[in-house]
Curated annotation (Swiss-Prot):
Name of the protein in question: Palustrin-1d
Location(s), subcellular: Secreted
Native source organism of the sequence: Lithobates palustris (Pickerel frog)
Record family assignment: Belongs to the frog skin active peptide (FSAP) family. Brevinin subfamily.
Coiled coil (UniProt feature): none
Lineage start: Eukaryota, Metazoa, Chordata, Craniata, Vertebrata
Disulfide bonds: 21-27
Length: 27
């Protein structure tokens, strides 16, 4: 179960990074 949580956390961080990237247009 822990590995799944860590995977979700990683995906969430990537999603946030992508959102920031698009918002600031610093891709």
């Amino acid at each position: 179960a822990l590995s799944i949580l860590k995977g979700l956390e990683k995906l969430a961080k990537m999603g946030i990074a992508l959102t920031n990237c698009k918002a600031t247009k610093k891709c």
